[in-house]
Structure formats: structure tokens, C-alpha cells
């Protein structure tokens, strides 16, 4: 009895000599389930259960409507599959025929060689050469069709007038064509049709009158007696600078509104003569500092919805363009004023504001605010560049494609205040500190900067940055974005008289006066005489066809170069271009 009690008690009490669970588990016998059930799995016979013979499976009965619908769906699926198969077959056949047509000489040569056991005889070799020569002749015929015949009685390039090429006369012209009814005329400035839906060109004639003209040369005077010198287009409005330093606001799409702003007055010296006065101008009286002698505008440029101008004291001002109605626009920083950022309300139209952060600066550690003199400004669609008298470059506005020479990022997509970007050019001039920027230009989404090295007046370097999808960068590459300035392949020639369109650029070499162009050429607006869609590096333009010239001599035409005279200029709007004589 005592032994049993001791045994039970010992079982309840914890053992002092504790054994680990791992060791205890290792001593227990181990079994594999495969061994336990292997006999049944490997040797057990499988017997399927059979349905009793007296039990028959009954398919569910369907109504006539269900049977009809299923039949219709089946036929519909078959019709779709048949249509897809026919479409694929047509594409394969058309693609095969097109490939065979384009590569017919190669296919013909391959077939002749195969039929001759892999050998080429003299007859087959001559046949291949004949096919190649036939293709060359066909290509030459196509080029001849694109070259216009200039009548012998027409005036040549030595006589003043206007030549136009690109998208004109409702078709594409690859070579400059002289515009009738404009022979013998010179102009102060020409602005080609500013948009696709408004196919009217504008010009400022010798007297400073604003006229409109179409591609056939039919002219119409819009605003006489204003002594205009230059003009820009923005937000369906025309902005023109006169010799007094005033900017006129001209709603070119609403002639009645123009007429309401015109009044007549008599001349003080010649009372029997009357002159027209135009009253709608950008108001500078309240914002210019007349006490310091700030009285007139000396230069201006415009983007899609903004305008930037320079006064005679080198101060920059900006305004929104268009009509007086509130625009459904969001600022992209193109005004250079932080209070007009993408988060703020769009500024009122045609009201000038000073760009104080561009006109003034303060050195770090100083309390004195200094004045900065701006020498030139240039506007893209939604961005602006500026250079001061020391050669520093400033940029503000839209930077999606790197057109501000700033890194492309979410925080720098819209820059609403002027930022110095001179440092972006330092890697191109290692060890040099006194190089400076001397010129700037912009097209819609690309910027161009001219840098002059120290101690030389002829050693210039040309850079581009921004959108280069159409070859605007001019370095033989196509890029959607480029924030680091890259050199334009200008062959060390000094370039002048720039004209930037939507996605193409014209310029002129200073010594030889050769016209070079690059960028988009989908309408032949570069004037190179070929249907090349894009040109990613500067190319020479063939000279203007002479009256009665033999157009069958293709080598003499395409190997020639257009040289401009001192008074000749080339301008473009991105779709077409023109050459004119400047007053």
C-alpha cells in the first residue's frame, strides 16, 4: 500500500532529472505514413462505381426560346471568329504585297539566282542593274515633280519681295515660291499665320502700317499711321511696338473692336491732314518711374499667354495677354512673380507688373538692395529667359522638358520666380570664370543660349536645352527632354539673326551669310527641298530657284547654298517660313 502511494506521489511531483523534449522525442519510435498505407496504395485495386443499368440520365429539357438563343450565340461567335480571321488574312496579304513591291529588285535577283543554280550570268547582272537604274530614275522623277518651275518673266532673288514655303496654298511647298502682288515691297517686320485656324499673315510695311496678307499676296490695311516697328502674337491678340516705345494691343480677330479704338486727329503742322490714333495700349505711366527717366519700352517678347517687356532702364515687366475676360488658365510660373504661381489666381489681362526679383537683388550678408540691369529677354510658350549686363542667365516658368536648364522633377516643374542658371554651363568651360552669355532665344519648349569665351569676339559657343523630340536641340539627337545644356553642331561658325518657330529654328552665319535650319520639317518648312520629317542638326538650304532655271539638274540645285544679303531676313512660325526684304 505504501509502495503504490509512493509511486503515485512520485508521478505527480516534478522530476529533478529533467530530460529535454528533443531528446525524449528522438527516443520515441518514428513511423512514416507512406509505410503505413503503402500496401493499400500500391496493391489495392481501384473499382469504379457503376450506375445501375435500370437508371438512365435525364438531360434537362430546354424551351424553344433557349434553344434559339443558344443557336444564335453560336452563330454570332462563329461570325466574329470568321471576321477576325479574314482581317488577319487581309493584313498578311497586304503586308506581303507591300513588302514584295518595296523589295522587288532583291526578290527578282534572288529568284533568278535560284533558277540558275546559285550562279549569276551577265544577262541577270544586267537585269539587276537595269532595275536599280529604273528605281533611281523613278526617284529623280518624283523629285522633279516637287521642284516648281519658275517662269522666265518672274522677278528673281535680286529684287525685293517675299518668298514663302512650307504649309501654304493649302499644300506643302518644299522650295521657296515668290508671292505675287508683293514684288518690290520691303517690310519692317513679318509675322506668319500665328495658328492653324487663323491662316492670315501680318506685316509692318515701310511706313509702319499694320497690314494683313494671304499666301497669294492679297493685302489689306488693318491699322495705318501707327509707325510700328515689331510685333508678337499671344492669346489671339497682336502686340505691336511703335517708335515711341508704346505697345499696342490689337484684337486681330475682331475688326469691330479695333475700329472702336481708333480716332482721328488733325496734324498741328499740317492742319489739312488727319492722322489716326489708336487708344488701346499697355499702360506704363503708373508703373514706370518717370523721375528716373523710365519712359519707353525698348524690347519685348510674348508666349502663349504672357508678355515680358524691357524698359529703357533695363527693368523687366510682365502681364497676362488676351481679352478682359477671366481666362480659364493656370499659371505655370511664366510671370516670374511668386504671387502668380500655379497655386494662385491668374493675373488680370494686359495689366503690367514689375518682376522685382529679376530687377533687384541683394548679396548674402548685406542689407542693401541693389538694382540689376536686364539686357535681353526671350519667351517660350510658358517660360522666360533673361540675361543681365554681366552675362548672368535667369530663367523661370515651365520646366517639364528641362527648358529652364534645371533638373526635371516634381518640385521644379513650375518655377514661379527668377533663378540663376549660369552654373549649368560651367562644365563646358573648366578652369574659366570670365565667360559670359551674350544672346538668348526660345521656341515653344526649347531654349538657346550663346556663350562667348573671354578674350575673343569670334569664339562663340551655342547651347540648347529643353524639348528635342523634333530635333530642336541641333546636336543630331532626338530627345523628349534635356535639362543639361548641350552644344549645337554649328561647325564653329558664328550665328546671327535667329528665328524660332514652334519646333524649328532658322539662323544665319555671320561671315558667309548662309542660312541654316534644323527641327521639324513635316510640311517642308525648313526649305531643304526634301520630305525629311525631322532634321536633328543644322543643314544648309538650297538657294532660291532662278527664273527659267533648268530644274532637271538636281545636283546643282541640292548642292547649292542660300546666301542672304544684308537687308534680307528669314522668319518662321513652325508650319511655314518666308524670306523678305527688311527696311
UniProtKB/Swiss-Prot annotation:
One of its GO terms (biological process) is mitochondrial respiratory chain complex III assembly. It is found in: Mitochondrion membrane. It is a single-pass membrane protein. The keyword Transmembrane helix applies. InterPro entries: MitoProcess-Associated, RCC1/BLIP-II, Reg_chr_condens. Residues 1-25 form a transit peptide. The chain crosses the membrane at residues 83-105. It comes from the Eukaryota. Keywords: Membrane, Mitochondrion, Repeat, Transit peptide, Transmembrane, Transmembrane helix. One of its GO terms (cellular component) is mitochondrial inner membrane. It holds the Pfam family RCC1. RCC1 repeats lie at residues 332-389, 390-452, 459-510, 512-569. The keyword Mitochondrion applies. This is Protein FMP25, mitochondrial. The gene is FMP25.
